[in-house]
Amino acid sequence: MESALPSIFTLVIIAEFIIGNLSNGFIVLINCIDWVSKRELSSVDKLLIILAISRIGLIWEILVSWFLALHSLAIFVSGTGLRIMIFSWIVSNHFNLWLATILSIFYLLKIASFSSPAFLYLKRRVNKVILMILLGTLVFLFLNLIQINMLIKDWLDRYERNTTWNFSMSDFETFSVSVRFTMTMFSLTPFTVAFISFLLLVFSLQKHLQKMQLNYKGHRDPRTKVHTNALKIVISFLLLYASFFLSILISWISELYQNTVIYMLCETIGAFYPSSHSFLLILGNAKLRQAFLLVAAKVWAKR
């Protein structure tokens, strides 16, 4: 049974790869068609396009890394190839996490209602705020790349001094663990920011519901519905990102103790996040949902 597990996990990874490419490609295609036809695009749609493109890159990185790890081919990659592979993973993962976090901030500033002068100032300049945050995240990306480059340089120096097979395998596993740990630490910041946005949205919704009760109005007013929809999107991101984060953390520990089965399971769970969250974004967006249902109806009619 255990010998069949790599094949089973590989099939799941391939399925996630296909779903992820289809869902993210759909987001890019529909928004680009809308952009061309209307000659303009909202800020949230632009965010969705960039997020979807970054996730397509991440999904491809996951697939390539999976097969390299499965056949222990990573240690045969040259220094330049190793840098390209790891750096492209870091860049795609960085924008994948931060753009989803920025989307949460966008919903917070657009939907939430607070009397704080600072919040109102940010709310009036939401597009500039989003742009500044996006540019600010490049600092984290730059620091992450510097740290990883130091780890790569250190490993390559040791590899050139001792090229025996046993040393290469064990030292590469140590190097891989260090890279994963560094990436995990840099992933904590966007998760924390998204979680704070979620708490503020919940607090804003609670205040709004209390106000509705005082005014003897029902909870089905448009503002409540907008709050609820935004919360669903942010909650789905947080839950899936938490599973992604935990899978990276556990795979890091399992790789440290050389538990291959747990490592493969965590990698499979981690790949579920960039594939499934984009599908949930389609269902949570009125334009994308309508286009998806239209395409699904046409496909079903041809059967």
Swiss-Prot record:
InterPro entries per UniProt: TAS2R
SUPFAM superfamilies in UniProt: Family A G protein-coupled receptor-like
Glycosylation sites: 162, 166
TM region(s), chain numbering: 8-28, 56-76, 86-106, 129-149, 185-205, 233-253, 262-282
GO terms, molecular function: bitter taste receptor activity; G protein-coupled receptor activity
Main location: membrane
Signal peptide: none
Residue ranges that the UniProt entry lists as topological domain Extracellular: 1-7, 77-85, 150-184, 254-261
Alphabetical keyword list: G-protein coupled receptor, Glycoprotein, Membrane, Receptor, Sensory transduction, Taste, Transducer, Transmembrane, Transmembrane helix
GO BP annotation list: detection of chemical stimulus involved in sensory perception of bitter taste; positive regulation of cytokinesis
Membrane topology: Multi-pass membrane protein
Subcellular location: Membrane
Any Pfam family the entry gives: TAS2R
Reported function: Receptor that may play a role in the perception of bitterness and is gustducin-linked. May play a role in sensing the chemical composition of the gastrointestinal content. The activity of this receptor may stimulate alpha gustducin, mediate PLC-beta-2 activation and lead to the gating of TRPM5.
Additional facts recorded: Most taste cells may be activated by a limited number of bitter compounds; individual taste cells can discriminate among bitter stimuli.
Family: Belongs to the G-protein coupled receptor T2R family.
Annotated protein name in UniProt: Taste receptor type 2 member 13
Source organism of the structure: Pan troglodytes
